[in-house]
Curated annotation (Swiss-Prot):
Subunit structure: Homohexamer; trimer of dimers.
Gene Ontology molecular functions: cyclic pyranopterin monophosphate synthase activity
Disulfide-bond pairs as recorded: none
Gene that specifies this protein: moaC
Residues the entry annotates as binding substrate: L75, C76, H77, M113, E114
Annotated InterPro entries: MoaC, MoaC_bact/euk, MoaC_sf, MoCo_biosynth_MoaA/MoaC, Mopterin_CF_biosynth-C_dom
HAMAP family in the cross-refs: MoaC_B
Protein's UniProt name: Cyclic pyranopterin monophosphate synthase
GO biological process: Mo-molybdopterin cofactor biosynthetic process
Length: 161
């Protein structure tokens, strides 16, 4: 089992020193879901929400969140992201919105937290914009789908998960 990288020998939290690591292309994808009543989802799909375009706002929020992950999550490195993408898809058959984020850079540390933050904040933005209509929406699950690049190797969620 791997050791926790953000805990030093004395058991104290610390920021990992990545200065000796090689720069590689790193990429991560994450997903989140927001489940709601069919009427709420229909309002988002047909664009009749009084606050405007819910998907456009959530997309921008997710992109902005990825860029600011280092300010939100202690011990994360500030990263020079080369790409952030947030896709939102209505899934009427499940009364939910699926959010998928992609983050990429060439650097010394991974972008998993940025991808997870992008998907999470996009989901929170959907909730915020729709809470006047429905307060019992459910956010989740939120998970890492894949990562590539770096010393720890590649990871991909099993297609059956």
């Amino acid at each position: 089992m791997s050791q926790l990288t953000h805990i030093n020998a004395a058991g104290e939290a610390h920021m990992v020193d990545v200065s000796a690591k090689a720069e590689t292309v790193r990429e991560a994808r994450a997903e989140a879901f927001v489940t709601m009543r069919s009427e709420t989802l229909a309002m988002i799909i047909d664009g009749s929400h009084h606050k405007g375009d819910v998907f456009a706002t959530a997309r921008i929020a997710g992109i902005q969140a990825a860029k600011r992950t280092w300010e939100l999550i202690p011990l994360c490195h500030p990263l020079l992201l080369s790409k952030v993408e947030v896709q939102l898809q209505a899934e009427p058959e499940h009364n939910r919105v699926r959010i998928e984020s992609l983050c990429r850079l060439t650097g010394k540390t991974g972008v998993e937290m940025e991808a997870l933050t992008a998907a999470s904040v996009a989901a929170l933005t959907i909730y915020d914009m729709c809470k006047a209509v429905q307060k019992d929406m459910v956010i989740g699950p939120v998970r890492l789908l894949a990562k590539s690049g770096g010393k720890s190797g590649d990871f991909k969620v099993d297609a059956h998960d």
